[in-house]
Design a protein with these regions (language model features):
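RNA/tRNA-interacting regions in translation and RNA-turnover enzymes
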Residues: 14-76
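Covalent nucleotidyltransferase
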Residues: 53-121
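Generic secondary-structure transition motif, activating predominantly at the C-termini of alpha-helices
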Residues: 12, 35, 100-103
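Intrinsically disordered, low-structural-confidence terminal and linker regions
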Residues: 1-19
Length: 121
C-alpha cells in the first residue's frame, strides 16, 4: 500500500495510478494551487523580446521542453511523480534515483516538467 494512491497498474518498470487517484487531499490541493497561481504565469519569450516583456528584478528562468507539469513528491519516505489531475507514477528509475538522492531529507514537493527523451535511431 502506498501513501500516494490505493491502487496502481503496471507502467514500464514501475506503476501508475489514474486521474483522481492521488490520495492525500492536502498534497493534491497544493499541486492544483501551484498550477493555478504559478504555472499559469509561465511565459514563452523570444530572446529579442526579453527587454520589452520581462519585468526588471530577480527572476527564475528555465528552458521550455515539450512536457507536462508534474511534481516530484516525497511523503513519509516514499517518492512519486504526481500530477495536478491526481495521476501518480511510482517505481520508475527516476523515482528510485530521487529516493536515493533525497534519503535523509523530510517531505518535499518539487515542481517540474515531466518529459521523455527518445533515443536516436
Amino acid at each position: 500500500m502506498s501513501v500516494f494512491a490505493a491502487s496502481f497498474e503496471p507502467y514500464g518498470a514501475g506503476q501508475k495510478a489514474p486521474i483522481g487517484a492521488l490520495a492525500p487531499a492536502t498534497i493534491k490541493a497544493r499541486l492544483v494551487a501551484y498550477k493555478r497561481n504559478v504555472a499559469k504565469r509561465y511565459r514563452i519569450v523570444a530572446p529579442d523580446q526579453i527587454s520589452d516583456r520581462i519585468p526588471e528584478g530577480n527572476l527564475y528562468i528555465s528552458t521550455k521542453v515539450d512536457g507536462e507539469l508534474w511534481f516530484l513528491v516525497k511523503l513519509q519516505g516514499e517518492v512519486a511523480f504526481c500530477s495536478p489531475t491526481g495521476r501518480v507514477i511510482v517505481g520508475i528509475p527516476a523515482c528510485i534515483e530521487a529516493e536515493k538522492q533525497l534519503s535523509g531529507e523530510g517531505d518535499i514537493i518539487v515542481a517540474g516538467e515531466l518529459f521523455a527523451v527518445v533515443p536516436k535511431g
